Amino acid sequence: MDCEFCTSAGGDILWQDERCRIIRVGGKEAVDFPGFCRVIWKEHQREMNDLSVADRRHLMGVVFATEAALRSLYQPFKINLASLGNATPHVHWHVIPRF
């Protein structure tokens, strides 16, 4: 398996527990989006429904906590939440402050 989120952290780790991590997205992806973070599930799974109900709740709790922290820190006009997985088919969420 050649999954970038399984073989590397995916960015600077801001926080992690035994199930997921929050990373700060850097480089070209983040130039126009200060505060751009990803919440990445540690175990390789392609779809949210591959997680147990308890794991889905845990992951979404971390996503919402990340959103709340970014709102407090940056006071953006809007926060975008997205989970697509087309380029990297590994469960992860984008949490993007918009200004």
Q: Where in the sequence are the language-model features?
A:
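HIT superfamily nucleotide-processing domains
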Residues: 1-99
